[in-house]
Amino acid sequence: MKIKITAEEGQYNAHDAYMHFERQKWAELRDNVELTLSEDDLRQLQGINESLSIQEVIDIYLPLSRLLNLYVKTQQRRHTVRDKFLNSKNENVPYIIGIAGSVAVGKSTTARILQAILSHWPEHPRVALVTTDGFLRPNRELVARNIMHKKGFPESFDTKALIDFVAAIKSGKELISAPIYSHLTYDILPDKKLHLEKPDIVILEGLNVLQSASNYPDHPQRTFVSDFVDFSIFVDAETQLLKKWYVQRFLKFRKGAFTDPKAYFHSYSQMEETQAIDISEKIWDEINGVNLEENIRPTRDRANLILTKATDHQVDSVHLRK
């Protein structure tokens, strides 16, 4: 049975640009889409600090994958109309899905889930995932510019390279390469590249995918990554939750990845837990929290869809642009 949601049921403010759906109402929009992921698949998709459940995928991500599939098929039909008009066959350009949000909100997990589910739809089996972390400037350059403490802020990215990359995707270029960032070494891997070959969909995940000229009216750059994004998602949560999740993740890294002698933050693994908590809170207060309020959250209302998370990392409401 098909579930029909009217605009009146969905909207929560007549003057708002979004329709609001509580979790259960959104889950009803799944429309019999089958779950193709197993428990093992979910474990591989989980972030460092999330308890991703099958129910979360069923309630939130299956309806979202259905919506995205409809959008992608609509674009493909437009390409067919174009080809009929031109009386020629042209290659379809990839559909770009942008995923933005704060550090520690779970953007990467959302991106990996969508990549896994969307690749099972027959209309678009080739789904690539790219993180904008790969377009951070190398540490040596950040040090030379005296902005190492601003890593993750707009000025720490090679914005021209990132825009050239997404422009190449939208130009239909068959083989495209992207730099790879290592969270272990906290730097770009100089000898490694991510290669994209004729993807149907590209999921672009990062802090800065929704930034636009409206966020930087005095900036000389007039082209932004968001200009190339077909559908955008913002993963949101209250600031105090984000700080809590960041500290929890930091402590897990301290006992995990940071213990590797090659890790940039290896010294943190030797600290007492109370000291590690103090340092992680300081990093949040002076860097990540500031970046969130100044550069990330102001882009939220540009998203086509907002996923709002509650205390347990589970999405409790969805906002869909009208």
From Swiss-Prot:
Belongs to the prokaryotic pantothenate kinase family. It comes from Psychromonas ingrahamii (strain DSM 17664 / CCUG 51855 / 37). One of its GO terms (molecular function) is pantothenate kinase activity. Pathway: Cofactor biosynthesis; coenzyme A biosynthesis; CoA from (R)-pantothenate: step 1/5. ATP binds at residues 101-108. Signal peptide: none annotated. Pfam families: PRK. It is found in: Cytoplasm. Gene3D superfamilies: P-loop containing nucleotide triphosphate hydrolases (3.40.50.300). InterPro entries: P-loop_NTPase (IPR027417), PanK (IPR004566), PRK/URK (IPR006083). The keyword Nucleotide-binding applies. Keywords: ATP-binding, Coenzyme A biosynthesis, Cytoplasm, Kinase, Nucleotide-binding, Transferase. The lineage of its organism: Bacteria, Pseudomonadati, Pseudomonadota, Gammaproteobacteria, Alteromonadales. Its main location: cytoplasm. One of its GO terms (biological process) is coenzyme A biosynthetic process. The keyword Isomerase does not apply. It is an enzyme of class 2 (transferase). This is Pantothenate kinase. It catalyses: (R)-pantothenate + ATP = (R)-4'-phosphopantothenate + ADP + H(+). One of its GO terms (cellular component) is cytoplasm. CDD domains: PanK (cd02025). Its EC number is 2.7.1.33.
